[in-house]
Amino acid sequence: MDSLLNSITIDPAERRKTQNRLAKRKSRIHAGKQQGAMEAANALVGRQPTSVFTSTQQTIKGITSMNGSAEPPNGAVRLIQTASPLNEAAEDYSHTTSASSSSTMGTSLQTWHSHVSSDEITYTGQDMNLYPSSIFTNLSPGSSSSLSMQDSNVILCSPMTSPMTRHVMPSCSKDNYGVQRSKPGSPLHIASAMGHLKVVKTLITYGANVNEVDAAGYSPIHYATRNNHTAIVALLLEKGADWSYNVRSIDTSSGLAEALIHIIET
């Protein structure tokens, strides 16, 4: 038997053909397994929810539409990503459109310069720090020192633009306006003037002084009354705001001011 096997001669050409066929077969099997794994992975990805990615894209688009680039202006992304007990106040962080800003300011406000348009009142990328993202991350209960305009390390207080200041303080003299522009008061002054009720509530909860006066000698209730923010006036009164002096100094063309003066004198 062994001699018979030894006598059989295998053609080298046939051997190469056989080896090639085996190699091709092995390659096809490997490729099939790889394709199957890829299809399984793709099917798994296809079943994943896309809401997170959609939300992220919408956020980026929103930021891009605000300042013309994909770069977040002054920490806007940090504000959006912040998850804290102050999220309710964050809902009042509205400054991206003319409509929202105009509705907050009211329609009866005056300007010194008639050429100032409503578009100029809109917060731009440079004005985004009116309420920095730190307003929702760096506050702690009773932290009144960090909410005071006298604190040199104030993180929540920043100057308003000139057109905005003209609307907030239409009855202020130009001299006082210049002082006020450089030292606009505490964050509570700004929130009260802008009509941001939830921000006002948050600032008071975390220690803001409702009777603090700014460089022009006015407290938050003065600006809330001047701009007809009734709910904020009521809240400030509830929290102990001293309204008698402030309200008497307000231009009585404001219906709210007239009502409060009537209450004072009766």
Swiss-Prot record:
Bias-annotated ranges (Basic residues): 18-31
GO CC entries: nucleus
InterPro entries: Ankyrin_rpt, Ankyrin_rpt-contain_sf
ANK repeat boundaries on the chain: 183-212, 216-245
Keywords, ordered alphabetically: ANK repeat, Nucleus, Repeat, Transcription, Transcription regulation
Stretch list, region Disordered: 17-36
Recorded phenotype for the gene knockout or disruption: Produces significantly smaller lesions and fewer spikelets with blight symptoms on susceptible wheat cultivars.
Pfam families: Ank_2
Induction conditions: Expression is induced during infection of coleoptiles of wheat seedlings. The fusaoctaxin A gene cluster is silenced by H3K27 trimethylation by the histone methyltransferase KMT6.
SUPFAM superfamilies listed in its UniProt record: Ankyrin repeat
Subcellular location, record wording: Nucleus
PANTHER family associated with the record: ANKYRIN REPEAT DOMAIN-CONTAINING PROTEIN 39, ANKYRIN REPEAT DOMAIN-CONTAINING PROTEIN 39-RELATED
Function: Transcription regulator; part of the Fg3_54/C64 gene cluster that mediates the biosynthesis of the octapeptide fusaoctaxin A, a virulence factor that is required for cell-to-cell invasiveness of plant host. Positively regulates the expression the Fg3_54/C64 gene cluster.
Descriptive protein name: Transcription regulator FGM4
Species: Gibberella zeae (strain ATCC MYA-4620 / CBS 123657 / FGSC 9075 / NRRL 31084 / PH-1)
Recorded name of the encoding gene: FGM4
